[in-house]
Amino acid sequence: MLIIETLPLLRQHIRRLRQEGKRVALVPTMGNLHDGHMKLVDEAKARADVVFVSIFVNPMQFDRPDDLVRYPRTLQEDCEKLNKRKVDYVFAPAVEEIYPQGLEGQTYVDVPGLSTMLEGASRPGHFRGVSTIVSKLFNLIQPDIACFGEKDFQQLALIRKMVADMSYDIEIVGVPIIRAKDGLALSSRNSYLTAEQRKIAPGLHNVMNSIAEKLIAGNRELQEIIAIAEQELNEKGFRADDIQIRDADTLLELTETSKRAVILAAAWLGQARLIDNQSVTLAQ
């Protein structure tokens, strides 16, 4: 496994791989890798000849400076995990390598609509930062496929739209959420939880299951369903942030013709803002 930190060296290897006709997969990450990331790596390895994993804590997508400062940086441990998985390349650039002129005045990629709705409404600029760094990684690594987790449901939808709108010839692969045995979705931010909070954390998934059961049963009183769910979360020790029930294919409001719904949930538990989602097939 080769660790690349500079753009000239990256470009040198990309040129060689292209000349050799290799099929390249990219797994973009911000590090602090867990089993969910490893599932992305496994999917990439199954679909390509060469796998790149990028590790870059992207300052452009953080809406709160304190969150950027305390985001876990575990490059050595991450590389050890990836080496055991037989990843070919790790691209781990410094911020100055990606944004040599700084963030102010940086050209960016913005995806209208999807970047400012739902999660984007509560985190201004977040998705603009995501789409910009993913676009830069696509330009630099020129992958044939890229793997993203379905835990970040809106992010995956945004990247699919960006790829379509910008005419990237890249297959986007969504990989299902990986959960702990108690149902908690794996996330780098789970490391913010205390031992006591970790015991409470699966409650978010349990509340989503309750919402899903109501939708499957034909209940469409969405405001009431959401209000009850928020109350349940608060009673469990969470601070409910946002719960939405949307059309899984458009992320717009549910209509009578919607075939699938997605439950999008975000809640604070101590210093950790946990997000999760669950798709539901609706009775027609």
Curated annotation (Swiss-Prot):
Q: Does the keyword Ligase apply?
A: yes
Q: Which residues bind beta-alanine?
A: Q61
Disulfide linkages recorded for this protein, renumbered to the chain, are none
Q: Mind naming one GO cellular-component term on file for this protein?
A: cytosol
Where's the active site on this chain? H37 (proton donor)
Q: Tell me one GO molecular function of this protein.
A: ATP binding
Pathways per UniProt:
Cofactor biosynthesis; (R)-pantothenate biosynthesis; (R)-pantothenate from (R)-pantoate and beta-alanine: step 1/1
Q: Which reaction does it catalyse?
A: (R)-pantoate + beta-alanine + ATP = (R)-pantothenate + AMP + diphosphate + H(+)
Q: Which UniProt keywords apply?
A: ATP-binding, Cytoplasm, Ligase, Nucleotide-binding, Pantothenate biosynthesis
Primary site of residence: cytoplasm
Q: Where is coiled-coil annotated?
A: none
- Residues binding (R)-pantoate are Q61, Q155
Q: Name one Pfam family in it.
A: Pantoate_ligase
Q: Where, subcellularly, is it found?
A: Cytoplasm
Which positions does UniProt annotate for ATP binding? 30-37, 149-152, 178, 186-189
The UniProt record lists the EC number as 6.3.2.1
Q: What else is known?
A: The reaction proceeds by a bi uni uni bi ping pong mechanism.
Recorded hits in HAMAP family, A to Z, give: PanC (MF_00158)
Q: What does this protein do?
A: Catalyzes the condensation of pantoate with beta-alanine in an ATP-dependent reaction via a pantoyl-adenylate intermediate.
Assembly, in brief, is: Homodimer.
- Name the family the entry cites: Belongs to the pantothenate synthetase family.
UniProt name for this protein? Pantothenate synthetase
Species whose genome carries this gene: Salmonella paratyphi B (strain ATCC BAA-1250 / SPB7)
Q: What is the lineage of its organism?
A: Bacteria, Pseudomonadati, Pseudomonadota, Gammaproteobacteria, Enterobacterales
